[in-house]
Amino acid sequence: MAGKSSLFKVILLGDGGVGKSSLMNRYVTNKFDTQLFHTIGVEFLNKDLEVDGHFVTMQIWDTAGQERFRSLRTPFYRGSDCCLLTFSVDDSQSFQNLSNWKKEFIYYADVKEPESFPFVILGNKIDISERQVSTEEAQAWCRDNGDYPYFETSAKDATNVAAAFEEAVRRVLATEDRSDHLIQTDTVNLHRKPKPSSSCC
């Protein structure tokens, strides 16, 4: 890949069994493994891509969703550029737990400005016909909790998987653009010669 590449850390959070590992593997390797076991602690994979002319290396972190693994996963939240909150559309409890996952991430990642941090919401397993969470419910949650982008995905058949991760990159880039603008307005030019000053002795 030509050109300078930025490294973005993206973390997948959500209940155990919602398909976080499958989503990561589908996106990075374009494979789906029906025998995938629950993650213990954390795992990550890298993916090089170009989004809107920006070359990016996305470091995707997959975390264990079970409560007993909390102490293993939370140290890895820091330094994340984007968080993909994930639930399964056939599991209403995993949807109800999104708020808890968001709070846990904000606390352990030490997010300074939660209202502007880029979250993307994924409703996974739309290939399953019996759903417990409607599209409208999920969209309403996203509107009420920060106007987050929402994608209904299937790691099994790859529906919207690439689109969701690419949107995560766009959100990070937009956040960086805002930060750069703020920084540029307050920078000090170290190369500018100081104005001569007069003093009386």
From Swiss-Prot:
PROSITE patterns: RAB. GTP binds at residues 17-22, 34, 38-39, 65, 124-125, 127, 155-156. Mg(2+) binds at S21, T39, D62. A motif (Switch 2) lies at residues 64-78. Its EC number is 3.6.5.2. The modification Phosphoserine is found at S179. The modification N-acetylalanine is found at A2. Changing W61L: Loss of interaction with HPS4. InterPro entries: P-loop_NTPase (IPR027417), Rab9 (IPR041824), Small_GTP-bd (IPR005225), Small_GTPase (IPR001806). It is a lipid-anchor. A motif (Switch 1) lies at residues 31-42. Belongs to the small GTPase superfamily. Rab family. PANTHER family: RAB FAMILY, RAS-RELATED PROTEIN RAB-9A. The small GTPases Rab are key regulators of intracellular membrane trafficking, from the formation of transport vesicles to their fusion with membranes. Rabs cycle between an inactive GDP-bound form and an active GTP-bound form that is able to recruit to membranes different sets of downstream effectors directly responsible for vesicle formation, movement, tethering and fusion. RAB9A is involved in the transport of proteins between the endosomes and the trans-Golgi network (TGN). This is Ras-related protein Rab-9A. It comes from Homo sapiens.
